[in-house]
Amino acid sequence: MSERDAIRAFSHMLETIFVRMRAEGTGSQTDAMQRWLDLYNVGSLPIDKKSYKALRLMDRETTDQQKEDATCAICLDNLQNNVDIPEDHVIKEELKIDPTTFGTTVIVMPCKHRFHYFCLTLWLEAQQTCPTCRQKVKTDKEVEEEERQRNLEELHDSMYG
């Protein structure tokens, strides 16, 4: 997916969120989303800064496992609600997930904050931190280096006990 397509998909998601919030008439949610948009410039990270592998390693839950009052801090929707994925959204091959699961999955980050999988993938296109506490998310390069180091240690241990 090109940067332009990612921005278009992200914009579509935000538009859907704003329409939903306007329909509900909750000004505080709209204000919160507007502040979020003002704080974060939606750009795309270079490919060596992506976090797809780290995302695949994070714990997963389904939307029906979430508490009634749990909210996704990215879209401000209840975590029990499935995400309506735009028809033109292309799921990145690196995520290795089927479209049905993508909309019903909640990711539990290492810091224990939970987000809709779809929302978090869009967030990680532009940021390398948890949207709530700003804990850094490892890049694919860092995950690969850790895996390489772990494999070397296992090989060493198997050879020298």
UniProtKB/Swiss-Prot annotation:
The keyword Zinc applies. Pfam families: zf-RING_2. GO terms for molecular function: zinc ion binding. InterPro entries: HRD1_E3_ubiq-ligases (IPR050731), Znf_RING (IPR001841), Znf_RING/FYVE/PHD (IPR013083). PROSITE patterns: ZF_RING_2 (PS50089). Keywords: Metal-binding, Zinc, Zinc-finger. It comes from the Eukaryota. SMART domains: RING (SM00184). Residues 140-161 are annotated as: Disordered. A zinc finger (RING-type) spans 72-134. This is Uncharacterized RING finger protein ZK637.14. It comes from Caenorhabditis elegans.
